[in-house]
């Protein structure tokens, strides 16, 4: 697209800010709160349209609010307090997101992913599973799922995991059986494998807190609005029954609903064996990497009472540097990690301001009045269903989470009977699982969609079927299991 045709992407966020700012301030809100909300909404529109990278959009929004803080961030009462310096306070607010533990946890997880990539351990694990399980097409589907499952806890970019590690491996498999893209032979085995690639990425993105950046964004938003949080272990245990069910069910379900013509063969295991021989035996760097990852997972699951999850990640990254698994240049040059670091920290800062100015509490009271008289369970399920279905309207999981999660959290806070940890975990799971609905929902989606093995009609049909199954199972386990371990 030519720059001259993109002007509207720049003007739309500004127009939204202006329109909201000109609307009379609603009853119960102060003027600075309403103006803050106007800028916040403009940032969300900017994240959706992306005239510039998302991190830049968020930083511009923070800059506007901080510079105009006497009118957008602070109340007249605050400004009138003796010794109150809005310049220092606004700067402190602007950079507050960078001290959030969630930010450093996801940054550490990105470095773990770099270690997997540099040592070749991630590729080796996937090839071993393909070699051992690739004799039957159904088992090959499980190999794809297990590969994603092993990589997910330490790869917070589902795009890097799905499109960067798994896809480059599995795209080599269909041609071994003369299953070609954009051809009638694609259904031989290629279509099943490619569908398993994207559906496994979506499932594993929901299983672990550190499997997808928006999961951590949600926790940051939750903490800024309520001071409550979910640890890595809370997320893992809360998702455990649903995780086991989906990991075991999905490959078989895909096999039944989108059956491959070819049921078995030896070409894939032989190819994987050749690739493994080319890699050579497990080297010392891979062994060190494996040991550190196992240690990190153990501490994340069982060490919550003794050490913060972010501190675990921070310490493991330091050990990775000392053990020469990664270099300092790897950290400095990791554009993806720094990109997420900046936009996630900036969005958490903006969400904190939304709460500090009183908008969240006002919106919660507004919802409380409209939701009164309904069962908390019915309200919770209805909110999850609405949140899930709105995924159709977003091409970015980050924009989706940034736009809707604060409203979902405010709605839950409006009804004290709704258990916030359970509700937020259901919202978090919906972010990952709902990514299966469309071929544009998350980073790897267009990669698999564009592989030539997944026709448009098939993708939308399977997305709707699997999406519905995921939603039903999420609601059931959310109501029956999550309260047992989270409350």
From Swiss-Prot:
Name of the featured protein: L-tartrate/succinate antiporter
Pfam families, A to Z: Na_sulph_symp (PF00939)
Topology term for the membrane: Multi-pass membrane protein
Family of the protein in this entry: Belongs to the SLC13A/DASS transporter (TC 2.A.47) family. DIT1 subfamily.
Domain of life: Bacteria
Statement: the UniProt record of this protein carries the keyword Endoplasmic reticulum: no
Transmembrane segments: 10-30, 33-53, 54-74, 93-113, 137-157, 189-209, 236-256, 292-312, 313-333, 340-360, 370-390, 393-413, 418-438, 465-485
Principal place of residence: membrane
GO CC entries: plasma membrane
Catalytic activity, reaction form: (2R,3R)-tartrate(out) + succinate(in) = (2R,3R)-tartrate(in) + succinate(out)
GO terms, molecular function: antiporter activity
Presence of keyword Transmembrane: yes
Keywords in alphabetical order: Antiport, Cell inner membrane, Cell membrane, Membrane, Transmembrane, Transmembrane helix, Transport
General function of this protein: Catalyzes the uptake of tartrate in exchange for intracellular succinate. Essential for anaerobic L-tartrate fermentation.
Subcellular location(s) per record: Cell inner membrane
